[in-house]
A protein has these predicted regions:
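The feature preferentially marks the first beta-strand/turn patch immediately downstream
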Residues: 1-277
Length: 277
């Protein structure tokens, strides 16, 4: 089988989308599908190619070896990427979605049908609109696709192997379609604030707090980042006289640090030794 350089396991904290639907693994899987599908170009007639997005997405596609859903909120991601800092590997392999899969699917279909584009350059080249979920006309187009998906009992190929109950898909289509009907935009996400209203005429946007009990990060959760604690060397204990050929011991006291990078230089200022401890 194919070997990967690194494996990262993600345990997601899912909450409700702003339209009330529960975020789930299908949102993650469809997001990955989108990156893989739009990050490659099979030929010059490939309809899932965008002049701006595809070159960017292709960088991630080249390193993703595979994924393995473990349970309803856990997934293993295999990538050909390594870094001495494991946090960097996790960041590189991270999968997430900031919108429900059905919104992404409707956007994709509108672009494939030639009604819109994912980028400014693509819109200019094809003489179509640069799709924006906040613009009422584009939102109504998305709503039309959602209603069509519901009527035709459409199940995205990206999710066929993971979910078969059409009631689930229909509830997603209906909830997002109703959101557009009420709010006149299709911006649905999962953060602590949601877009309540947008008026192009008055150039005004109304944003409200998303007061939902499923949101995982309660008030004050991120407060520790408000006061940054910088690493600092508080004291250094070293002998006044150093004798050549004898062992040298230097004690260093620090605060808010878990490692120290030290280096030694000779009389000419050239570095002779460097090590992270």
């Amino acid at each position: 089988g194919t070997q990967a350089t690194s494996k990262v396991r993600f345990d997601f904290k899912f909450s409700n989308w702003h339209n009330g639907q529960k975020m789930d693994m299908n949102d993650i899987l469809h997001s990955l599908y989108f990156t893989m599908e739009w990050g490659t170009q099979t030929d010059e007639n490939d309809k899932t190619f965008d002049v701006e997005f595809t070159p960017i997405a292709s960088q991630a596609v080249q390193t993703i070896i595979g994924i393995k859903p473990v349970d309803e909120d856990t997934i293993d991601v295999y990538v050909n990427y390594w870094h001495f800092d494991e946090g960097e590997i996790a960041d590189w392999a991270a999968l997430w979605s900031s919108m429900p899969w059905e919104i992404s699917a409707a956007m994709e279909q509108s672009v494939i049908d030639g009604k819109a584009s994912f980028s400014r350059s693509g819109a200019t080249n094809k003489n179509v609109s640069w799709i924006s979920l906040i613009i009422p006309n584009d939102a109504q187009m998305i709503q039309s696709y959602l209603n069509d998906f519901s009527e035709k009992k459409y199940i995205p190929k990206s999710l066929e192997s993971f979910e078969t109950d059409f009631n689930y898909f229909d509830s997603r289509y209906t909830a997002s379609s109703e959101w557009v009907e009420v709010n006149n935009h299709a911006v649905i996400s999962n953060g602590p604030f949601y877009l309540s209203a947008y008026s192009p005429e008055s150039r005004s946007i109304t944003v409200n707090a998303f007061d939902d009990e499923t949101y995982p990060f309660k008030l004050g959760y991120w407060s520790e980042f408000e006061k940054t604690k910088f690493p600092k060397i508080t004291n250094v204990y070293s002998p006044d006289i150093i004798q050549k050929g004898t062992e040298l011991e230097i004690n260093i006291e620090t605060s808010h640090a878990d490692s120290i990078l030290y280096f030694l230089t000779d009389s000419n200022g050239n570095s002779t030794l460097s090590e992270l401890i």
